[in-house]
Design a protein with these regions (language model features):
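Amphipathic alpha-helical repeat scaffolds of TPR domains
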Residues: 143-170, 195-207, 239-275, 305-311
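Blade-edge motifs of beta-propeller repeat domains
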Residues: 322-357, 390-410, 444-466, 497-517, ...
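Helix-turn-helix repeat elements of alpha-solenoid scaffolds
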Residues: 168-185, 213-227, 282-290, 338
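Gly/Ser/Thr/Pro-enriched helix-cap/hinge segments flanking short amphipathic alpha-helices
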Residues: 630, 679-681, 685-694, 699, ...
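Short coil/linker segments at helix-helix boundaries
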Residues: 165, 224-242, 250-295, 320-340
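Hydrophobic beta-strand segments that make up the repeating blades of beta-propeller
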Residues: 362, 372-379, 424, 428-433, ...
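Beta-propeller blade termini
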Residues: 360-369, 390, 411-422, 468-478, ...
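Short, conserved, GDST-rich strand-edge loop motifs in beta-rich repeat architectures
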Residues: 257-281, 431-436, 589-607, 657-665, ...
């Protein structure tokens, strides 16, 4: 039995003791600095991180230098002490931080280890610099009244990490204990307690309550802080008042969301920019938020984050734009789309897919072989089970999770499908522990009757638990069986070779893939078209890696050589051929946890953060950064994302699920339309897909069999109080032609993962092509393995060419009709047409419902 947290409680307490001792050597314990110094330091903050003796000091420095608050990470051997006003620090340390300026971490010896500090809030002369103020463990991005509550995201109690129910119970107990301890601390405050003690105790309680969704209780805790600050004439109190106002604004805005967007949900709620139908009707949370944000901006008018939140809050109460003071207003013209591909309406509610939950993964695929695409969903909440929604074929979905045997599969931030045993039934791989603590993964075998069996241990994928966010299933040795590469956080990533008998062997060392990093995404693709699938690894805080498959079970790292090692703080990634030239290109997003970049973009201000990257394949397996050329040099904090063809022109578009853990990170998810491989255009506003809630697992799929890609987005954040309904955006249709293909491998893996498709067209006498690499798409969200390919208008399909994994020559099909579904079996001549009945999502067709082959009642 592996104990997640076993033996760590005492160690964690020891680290806390050392950290507090180290902090006390750097903090002013009295008002010994001259008042002029305190005044000059008003609004200036540093972040402090305590690193154990022999801990990863350089690792921490690199992350801080990139502008990320360390409270967002759980790095072994390091502990964030949060944001500390410069006025509270030792004079020499504060002076040194001021001298070097933001973005330059300073290392100082400390009792039991090392203290790493970095200036966050700039001095007045530096107010134009970006401040990364998002703290995952606090209500808002700025307030730092107490040591971080990041421990709420990890397990600090002994528990068997392979026992999912035990992990759930341990999490609940940990949170309950934290709330009890925080209440006790506030109740124990003596009359006239020093201001720092009052703020620390109430902020601890408020943060814990907000984590659970008790916004009213959290607001009361922060109001207690605000009342004390208003009554205290000291410079220290004046310096903290803005933070209290911001926290209260954020908490009240979230209270308004819970009362309206969650409890009284409609299809336009939280879609940015907000329409009249999205206005809050219940409670006064948003109105209170407007008042707090306005008062804050009177104190600190340069804060772009609060300025953005004020505009959003005003939209929710119907006073935008006129009700926002002109100097704080972000005008409506800033949000307009340059093009209009049509409105995608959210039909998740009537379709039966408006699950309310936290962040999680998504798979859209056919799990019962009936020709209708189903939806599988996971949740970061360790007590929430895996959900399977069966497509009834009438516009609605049925929750068959219990019947499928999935209720014991608790938690899991990400999902991906596979067919590891080549039986033709879609299996599920669940990844757990990402951003969190080591919890086991699960391989779920599809039994072919809409039930699943956990075969993780039997298959050889059990053993030690890890923090896992991403995995790539591919046939790396071309033996016809899908292998799996699993990317872990801070432990050795692993390559497992499929033996072909339902079991796997760890070949990581043999393959030359032994590395350790904070790996957030892994994807497979053949970058040099040599017939061997290569591997790209997206790391958070370190360079990204491209492993070239040399054949014979060996890989060579060539990321820098091929030009794809950036960005430094990356997340979701994928291979796709965005310009249809037959070579795989690469997109990598950044996870910059700041709200400030959003108003910067809309106001036309510089965005100093890292942009996403699009790397164009030069046709030899090396890449060129074409991000600015494509109009994508934007800083968009992204988590889940995927690609699809929203207008059936055959060029792949994409959707970014935005956000970060903080309740403050309300920003629209973004849709980008591909302009024939030459540029990408933001069509978020015109398509109506700019959801403000945090976006995670994303899938493009033709869920209604009408010949175009619909969009499913798993919505919700990391905290228990940040749950939200998922969204299903129905494609309005564009009248263009298309073809859907299901490939069945015989010598290749049966799911045909890693096959190349080329559709050769005659467009007005000119031969063109549309290409697809068979995959589920991005690393956070899985689209169907059946390939839907848009063919534009007026084209004639001349032939279909298929390069099967491991095959020497392509399989060629002719006589394929447009606007059809076909099945192609490797090595068999011709193809099999498949009939499909179209239907309207969310509107059951009269007389057209069908009984389930497994359960007529479904």
């Amino acid at each position: 039995m592996q104990q997640a947290g076993a033996g760590t409680t005492a160690l964690t307490r020891t680290r806390r003791a050392f950290a507090l001792a180290a902090l006390s050597t750097l903090l002013l314990l009295d008002a010994s600095l001259p008042q002029s110094t305190l005044s000059q330091s008003f609004g200036v903050f540093a972040e402090l991180v305590f690193v154990d003796a022999n801990g990863p000091v350089e690792h921490v420095q690199r992350r801080m230098q990139a502008g990320f608050l360390m409270a967002q990470l759980q790095i072994p051997g390091a502990r964030s002490l949060g944001r500390v006003p410069l006025s509270d620090l030792d004079a020499a340390f504060a002076a040194e931080l001021t001298r070097v300026g933001p973005g330059r971490p300073i290392v100082r010896p400390a009792p039991g280890g090392t203290m790493v500090g970095q200036l966050l809030s700039p001095a007045p002369a530096l107010l134009g610099e970006t401040e990364y103020r998002q703290d995952a463990a606090r209500v808002g991005s700025r307030p730092a009244f107490s040591p971080t509550n990041a421990d709420l995201l990890t397990l600090d109690v002994p528990v068997d990490s392979n026992d999912l129910a035990a992990v759930c119970e341990a999490k609940k107990k940990m949170l309950s204990d934290e709330i009890s301890a925080a209440r006790a601390a506030t109740e124990a405050l003596p009359a006239g307690a020093p201001l720092p003690e009052v703020m620390s105790a109430h902020a601890r309680l408020g943060g814990a309550l907000s984590f659970t969704g008790d916004m009213a209780g959290s607001i009361r805790a922060f109001e207690a802080i605000g009342e004390r600050l208003v009554a205290d004439p000291s410079p220290m109190a004046r310096g903290r008042l803005g933070m209290a106002l911001e926290a209260l604004g954020i908490l009240n805005l979230r209270r308004g969301e819970l009362d309206n967007c969650v409890m009284h949900h409609n299809r336009e709620m939280c879609l940015f920019p907000l329409s009249r139908a999205a206005r809050h009707q219940s409670g006064d949370g948003a109105q209170q938020a407007v008042a707090y944000f306005t008062r804050y901006l009177e104190l600190e008018p340069e804060n772009l984050e609060v300025r953005w939140l004020l505009n959003v809050a005003a939209m929710t109460v119907g006073t935008y734009p006129e009700g926002v003071p002109e100097r704080f207003r972000i005008g409506p013209a800033a949000f307009a789309s340059a093009e209009d591909p049509g409105r995608f309406w959210d039909v998740a509610g009537p379709a039966g897919l408006a699950r309310t939950d936290n962040a999680g993964g998504t798979i859209a695929d056919d799990f019962d072989g009936d020709g209708f695409l189903d939806i599988a969903l996971s949740s970061r909440d360790p007590c929430e089970p895996l959900r399977l929604y069966r497509n009834r074929g009438d516009g609605t979905f049925a929750d068959v999770s219990e019947r499928a045997g999935l209720l014991g599969q608790l938690g899991g931030l990400n999902l991906i499908q596979t067919d590891f045993d080549n039986d033709g039934w879609t299996d599920i791989f669940v990844m757990r522990g990402g951003w969190e603590t080591a919890i086991r993964n699960s391989l779920l075998r599809n039994n072919g009757d809409l039930t699943f069996t956990d075969v993780t241990e039997r298959a050889g994928l059990g053993g030690a638990a890890h923090r896992t966010h991403s995995a790539a299933w591919a046939d790396f040795d071309n033996d016809g069986w899908l292998d799996v590469f699993i990317g872990h956080e801070f432990s050795w990533s692993q390559l497992f070779r499929n033996r072909g008998d339902g079991t796997f062997e760890d070949v990581t060392d043999k393959a030359g893939l032994r590395f350790r990093s904070l790996t957030k995404a892994v994807v497979a693709g053949d970058v040099d078209n040599d017939g061997w699938q290569d591997l790209y690894v997206s790391n958070f805080g370190e360079r990204n890696l491209l492993f070239r498959n040399l054949g014979g079970g060996r890989f060579q790292e060539v990321g820098r050589e091929r030009g794809v090692s950036e960005p430094s703080f990356s997340f979701t990634t994928w291979f796709f051929d965005y310009d249809n030239d037959g070579w795989l290109d690469l997109l990598v997003v950044t996870d910059v946890p700041t709200v400030e970049e959003q108003p910067r973009e809309y106001l036309g201000l510089p965005q100093p953060g890292e942009t996403l990257r699009v790397y164009h394949n030069r046709g030899d397996g090396s890449f060129e950064d074409v991000t600015p050329v494509l109009g994508l040099a934007r800083v968009i904090p992204t988590m889940g994302a995927n690609f699809g063809d929203i207008d059936n022109d055959g060029f792949l578009d994409f959707y970014l699920g935005t956000g970060a853990p903080s309740y403050a990170t309300l920003m629209p998810n973004r849709m980008f339309r591909n302009k024939e491989g030459r540029a990408f255009v933001d069509v978020t506003q015109s398509t109506g897909t700019g959801h403000l809630q945090k976006g995670h697992g994303v899938a493009f799929a033709d869920l209604d069999n009408d010949g175009d890609d619909d969009l499913f987005a798993s919505l919700g954040g990391a905290f228990l109080g940040d749950k939200y309904q998922d969204a299903l955006f129905e494609n309005p249709g564009h009248g263009a032609s298309w073809l859907s293909l299901r490939l069945v491998g015989t010598k290749a893996n049966r799911a045909a993962i890693g096959a190349w498709l080329r559709l050769v067209l005659d467009e007005a006498g000119r031969e063109t092509q549309r290409t697809r690499w068979v995959t589920s798409g991005g690393s956070f969200g899985a689209s169907p393995l059946m390939q839907h390919i848009g063919l534009g208008r007026g084209a004639r399909l001349k032939r279909v060419e298929i390069d099967w994994p491991g095959a020497k020559t392509p399989q060629v099909l002719t006589g394929v009709a447009l606007n059809t579904w076909i099945e192609v079996v490797e090595g068999q001549s011709g193809f099999k047409p498949r009939s499909r009945q179209a239907f309207k999502l969310g509107a059951q067709r009269v007389g057209a419902s069908r009984a389930s082959a497994h359960n007529p009642g479904l």
